[in-house]
């Protein structure tokens, strides 16, 4: 999705509007898969947390990062921080057992990613690097939370994510991308 996102952002579309369109399409396509009885399940709160981390954390931050960077491939690498971060967060918050071998491998991954991120082309866009790291943290936390979602299928989780974040994303896009929002709105009616 990174190259497609970069192409979309290069076509004069703002990151928040791009995120809003992505979430809106998810609502349209995934609505038929929602089971409203799921709201009563004890773990539904984790669906909401997952949704906010993905819909309001990962997507907008990732697209803001892509809009600021000169190197899409470097942002793809930065997003790989999400994997070790998810394992670390799972160890801390969920009490998951992580072997010494896995800690060693996580350290090597973090060290390798840190070396790659000091490539001069990455450092040309420090704001993009920060946004990419925040997106990776959000994605890592969402990955950790997803372990609590065994009672739900993936289509349903993503559908709830889209429905719960659509109103907030719409407000954010309207507040921060007001001009573009006003241009798009009449064309969609």
What feature does the model see in each segment?
Residues 30, 50, 89, 101-118, ...:
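Hydrophobic transmembrane alpha-helices of multi-pass small-molecule transport proteins
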Residues 3-12, 66-68, 115-127, 175-189:
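Membrane-interface helix termini and inter-helical loops of multi-pass transporters
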């Amino acid at each position: 999705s990174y190259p497609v996102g970069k192409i979309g952002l290069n076509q004069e579309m703002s990151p928040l509007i791009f995120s809003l369109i992505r979430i809106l399409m998810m609502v349209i396509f995934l609505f038929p898969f929602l089971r409203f009885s799921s709201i009563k399940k004890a773990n539904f709160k984790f669906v909401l947390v997952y949704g906010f981390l993905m819909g309001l954390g990962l997507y907008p931050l990732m697209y803001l990062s892509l809009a600021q960077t000169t190197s899409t491939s470097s942002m793809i690498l930065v997003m790989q921080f999400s994997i070790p971060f998810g394992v670390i967060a799972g160890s801390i918050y969920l009490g998951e057992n992580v072997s010494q071998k896995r800690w060693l491998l996580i350290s090597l991954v973090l060290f390798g990613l840190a070396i790659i991120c000091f490539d001069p082309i990455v450092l040309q866009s420090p704001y993009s690097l920060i946004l990419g790291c925040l997106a990776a943290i959000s994605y890592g936390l969402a990955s950790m939370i997803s372990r609590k979602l065994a009672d739900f299928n993936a289509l349903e989780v993503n559908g709830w994510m889209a429905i719960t974040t659509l109103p907030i994303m719409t407000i954010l896009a309207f507040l921060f991308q007001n001009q573009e929002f006003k241009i798009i709105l009449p064309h969609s009616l």
